[in-house]
Amino acid sequence: PVFDHRKAHTAIFYSISNTQRGLRGVSFGSFLLKRVIDDLKRDFPKLDQFATLSPMPTLATWVGKNPQLLAELGIELAPDELASGTWANDAKQARRLRDPLRQLAANYLASAKQSNGHTAMPFDPVSRFHLGNGARVESLNFMADTSAKGFRQSYGLMVNYLYELDEIETNLEAFASTGSIAMSATLRRLARKK
């Protein structure tokens, strides 16, 4: 069946990237996203939710620097075994890994930082982009990218960033001034869980 696009209420952005090396560090994303959202709202007035389906390209790199985190979460596989994705072929093992991997990713998004000289910024470049444009880390998707690259980078996990229109400016200001990460209550609880 064909979906009546006039009834659409959610727009999902997939694979937003800042590809030009010379533009790294230049925040054109906020302007671009706001313009696209305005255009979409004009063309599809019922749209009221704007989110992304985004990769976490440096999750496995971070775990490689902190391998003890796997044992702390009860994950018995080594980082390279997780990155191979072979475990996903065993449905029972995949079910066992679902919650610990989601918790690992929530911890990563909430607390993995790198210093830029002034403030500690998220280790993940995609997270820096979306948080720097006022998004909120909303949810995690297990087995969302089962490509070899998806397993190699993030064990098959992907993340949704939500652009809540009435929160964008507040989130952006808090992130820019203090490095505060806007995150859904569900993910924040998951990140704190021990």
Regions found by a protein language model. Name each.
Residues P1-K194:
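Extended, composition-driven regions rather than compact fold-specific motifs
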